[in-house]
Structures are given as C-alpha cells and as structure tokens.
C-alpha cells in the first residue's frame, strides 16, 4: 500500500478518534453538570468569585481600585454565530475566550460587567485586550434599563444552565444593547469550559450576578435556571 493511500486513511482514523474524544468528554461534562445541586453550590459563590478574580481577572480589581466587586459577568453585543465564526472566535484573552475586534456597534471585543453597590460598571477592551473604556451606570439609569430573557432554541436549549438575556442600558444617547448569560461566557457559540468543575463555577458566578442585579433592581430581574 502506497504512502498516498495511507495518508487519507490515517487522517480519517485521527479525525474519528478526536470526534469520539470530544463527544465522550462533552457527555461526561453534561452528566456532571446535570447531577450538580446548584442550590447547594450557590453557597460557594463568594469563593468562586474570588478565585476567578484573582487568577483570571486581576485587571478588573485594578480598575475598580478601592470599590468592592459584589458580582461580575461577561457581556457581548448581539452577534450571529456565522459572523462570530467568520471572525475566528478561537483565541484566549487573559485566560478567557475573546470575541474579535472593535467596540459596541461594529466588531466585538470582550466586555465585562461589575456590580458594586447600586452602580453597574461596564468595561470595554481594545484589540490588544486592554481596557479602553469604563462606563458607570448609576441607580437612576439602571432603574430605566431593561433585561429580557432570550428564548432558547437549538443547541442553546440543551445548555439551559447558560440562559441568555438582552440587557439594554440607558445612556444620554441611545441605549447600549448587550447580551449576558447565566454563565461566564461571552457568546452563544459553545464556550462553556470543558472542565466540569470550571463549568459549575462559571454557572454559579453568572447566576450570582443576575440574582444580585435583580435583587437591587426589580426591573432587571429574570428567572434563574439554578433556582428553578
């Protein structure tokens, strides 16, 4: 058998092996997550938040200076799966998944939301991953903002713990429209961590943010998957 005949056979075998590995790992992850008592895990929210802030997001603590971080989440602008794939959502930014290139209304960069007291801080980043804009929404603006749940469909429906929401933040000009999830992910392309414990941690932190936001502002309250 010639080498030219062996090459496609080897490729097929390797591809099949990789596909089986990914499928098996995803199945194991789903089983662990589905069997997790998230109400009990929620008691670990503070520990999980401190761990992520220290290991993955120290720049948020630097930006907040002396202000306390009560809760945090990731955010993105509305972005279709096809567009995101075209822009290659593959890289990592400070240990987290990125979203592409420019700001709110065109191509995307990662955004971070931090709840501190009654204020909500929005951090936007440049193409180098550095924070280049810091907006603060006070109580008055948040009382006139909106948060609505995104209907689940297709693959996202299977990831019910990572429910998406549209967040419309009031400004002096037009509202800033963002998408946030009940999990530390930037977009609806599957970015959920492959490690089951990291997945549990990401879900708890995302839900903690939504719970604290809803507790402060009833107009920004949505149903939380881990309490349903």
Show where each model-derived region lies.
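Cytosolic-side junction of a single-pass transmembrane alpha-helix
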Residues: 14-27
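Short alpha-helical interface patches
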Residues: 2-7, 24-27, 139-141
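Beta-strand secondary-structure signal
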Residues: 166-168
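Terminal and domain-flanking low-complexity segments
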Residues: 3-17, 170-228
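Phosphoinositide-binding peripheral membrane targeting modules
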Residues: 96-164, 175, 184
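Anionic N-terminal interaction surfaces
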Residues: 24-113
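Hydrophobic, Leu/Ile/Phe/Ala-enriched alpha-helical segments that form helix-helix packing faces
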Residues: 56, 60, 64, 117-120, ...
């Amino acid at each position: 058998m010639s080498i030219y005949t062996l090459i496609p056979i080897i490729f097929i075998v390797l591809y099949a092996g990789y596909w089986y590995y990914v499928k098996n790992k995803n199945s194991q992850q789903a089983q662990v997550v589905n069997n997790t008592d998230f109400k009990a895990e929620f008691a670990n929210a503070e520990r999980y938040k401190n761990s992520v802030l220290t290991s993955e997001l120290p720049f948020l603590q630097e930006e907040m200076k002396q202000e306390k971080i009560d809760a945090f989440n990731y955010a993105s602008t509305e972005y279709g799966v096809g567009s995101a794939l075209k822009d290659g959502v593959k890289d990592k930014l400070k240990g987290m998944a990125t979203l592409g290139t420019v700001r709110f209304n065109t191509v995307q960069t990662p955004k971070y939301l931090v709840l501190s007291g009654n204020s909500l801080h929005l951090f936007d980043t440049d193409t180098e991953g550095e924070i280049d804009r810091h907006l603060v929404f006070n109580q008055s603006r948040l009382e006139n903002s909106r948060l609505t749940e995104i209907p689940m469909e297709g693959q996202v429906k299977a990831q019910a713990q990572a429910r998406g929401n549209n967040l419309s933040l009031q400004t002096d000009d037009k509202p800033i429209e963002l998408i946030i999830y009940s999990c530390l992910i930037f977009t609806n392309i599957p970015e959920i961590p492959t490690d089951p414990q990291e997945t549990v941690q990401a879900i708890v932190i995302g839900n903690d943010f939504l719970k604290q936001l809803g507790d402060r502002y009833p107009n920004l309250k949505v149903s939380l998957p881990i309490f349903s």
